[in-house]
Amino acid sequence: MLIPHYLHQLQLCARNRTLTTAKALHAHIVKLGIVQCCPLANTLVNVYGKCGAASHALQVFDEMPHRDHIAWASVLTALNQANLSGKTLSVFSSVGSSSGLRPDDFVFSALVKACANLGSIDHGRQVHCHFIVSEYANDEVVKSSLVDMYAKCGLLNSAKAVFDSIRVKNTISWTAMVSGYAKSGRKEEALELFRILPVKNLYSWTALISGFVQSGKGLEAFSVFTEMRRERVDILDPLVLSSIVGACANLAASIAGRQVHGLVIALGFDSCVFISNALIDMYAKCSDVIAAKDIFSRMRHRDVVSWTSLIVGMAQHGQAEKALALYDDMVSHGVKPNEVTFVGLIYACSHVGFVEKGRELFQSMTKDYGIRPSLQHYTCLLDLLGRSGLLDEAENLIHTMPFPPDEPTWAALLSACKRQGRGQMGIRIADHLVSSFKLKDPSTYILLSNIYASASLWGKVSEARRKLGEMEVRKDPGHSSVEVRKETEVFYAGETSHPLKEDIFRLLKKLEEEMRIRNGYVPDTSWILHDMDEQEKEKLLFWHSERSAVAYGLLKAVPGTPIRIVKNLRVCGDCHVVLKHISEITEREIIVRDATRYHHFKGGKCSCNDFW
């Protein structure tokens, strides 16, 4: 009678996730000498896994004299749930070689899940090969897991091949394929598959929305979310709200973001920590740091992401002192910072010239928190040194850091050379960039050309352009979005087909004429790398996407309200000058989020102090 009693009690612990009670029952079972009973041991492994105590599950498993497939699958699942998927593979390997057990369908599912979590396609293919020759080769649950694994690893053709081989497809396999297409930016295929999905539930809607957000297709994500609301799908899980808040953040769609925030409150999810974290990030990216701070202050429970999201938001908007003060508050509350926290902190120091504080924080990462600096941390420190005129120290950092420097690292130093007037050093670094990298960032091309042009090295300018042509560089078309009265309008560079093109042209022309008279503005055509006459270059500058977006905002937005722009590329130097002048002439605040930072244009000045 003892064993059935304890089995029942342990099953209740698993259902209710009561770890303390499970440990007490375990102690009684050990004391009674029945811990080696296989059903009890299997249940203990399962209970500890369900309660998030993977180390206890593994200990019970290791002490079992006789292991079966149930215990094997349970411990592998427990390790996966604890984000210890690497350990999952090693435990599988050791048990398989020592006990002679062959994996069953549950073990295969756990292994495939581990490979998906790790993004380890090599291990995943090995598991797939073992599965194909096993007696479970037609198991459709394992096949669905394989679809998910291949999709998460970006191998959509392999995922589709497995998907097509499933006779009776379940929600997992359908959703995995839809999510895979969406995450890869294959919009049409994702939507086509989603439309024919037999049963759409919240999980499948969330997968499509989340996939679009992750691939940078915020407008598509919001469109799907709107359709989901029209279909009256019950939102019983806050994950979909977190995804759509992320879409609003990426689009800097503050009006839509506030509407989603209202929905979060109405549905009672405002106490969820990860939802609040997403809202902090959203408001910061919509340039409303006050609202982000308000969300933070109202949170009853905060984790490291909560603190870090607000620190990064403050840093990106030039509020370095506030970001550093918040970090001190975070530490005093006993919250341990993570890697992202330090990226935000060093970035904050970089934009106000706090060299010693930046160095101190960089050293504190390892000394106080055991965090190994990444290439991103080194690049932030290099940017800090470069902005402060310490170019020799910055270059020495590149040569001594434990990572091979990449294009953004060298480009950060090259930008500092241009700003600090270190022409010879800039030319040397530019030569190194051209000879050592297949350049990918459009802003690097412009920087190279300007460095060579400033030294009147026209042959090098031509050579750089020729090499860029040989590399077949395909830069994303420049585009800018502006949110006006609940609608997001997108403009592309050179676009002259907008319904309001005549109004936009007249306003931009009027503003340009006033800039020329009032501010002595002369278009800086060095930002146009095409081989054409000056008049054509000026025309290209005139139709840069951020200018059209600002003009549209001035025409359509509520008078006196800030105009918020999101651009996918770095703002060019000429547009930066133009936006400063427009902010002064129109007495409007213009906030631009480009590929590198936030710019607050107000009264003829920019928060970046002309260095971005």
From Swiss-Prot:
Residues 486-516 are annotated as: Type E(+) motif. GO terms for cellular component: mitochondrion. Residues 1-24 form a transit peptide. It is found in: Mitochondrion. Residues 409-485 are annotated as: Type E motif. PROSITE patterns: PPR. The keyword Mitochondrion applies. Gene3D superfamilies: Tetratricopeptide repeat domain. The keyword Phosphoprotein does not apply. Residues 518-612 are annotated as: Type DYW motif. Keywords: Mitochondrion, mRNA processing, Repeat, Transit peptide. One of its GO terms (molecular function) is zinc ion binding. PPR repeats lie at residues 37-71, 72-103, 104-138, 139-169, 170-204, 205-235, 237-271, 272-302, 303-337, 338-373, 374-408. Pfam families: DYW_deaminase (PF14432), E_motif (PF20431), PPR (PF01535), PPR_2 (PF13041). GO terms for biological process: cytidine to uridine editing; mRNA processing. It comes from the Eukaryota. Involved in C-to-U editing of mitochondrial RNA. Required specifically for editing the mitochondrial NAD4, MT-CYB/COB and RPL16 transcripts. PANTHER family: DYW DOMAIN-CONTAINING PROTEIN (PTHR47926:SF495), PENTATRICOPEPTIDE REPEAT-CONTAINING PROTEIN (PTHR47926). Interacts with MORF8/RIP1 and MORF1/RIP8. Belongs to the PPR family. PCMP-H subfamily. This is Pentatricopeptide repeat-containing protein At4g14050, mitochondrial. The lineage of its organism: Eukaryota, Viridiplantae, Streptophyta, Embryophyta, Tracheophyta. The gene is PCMP-H13.
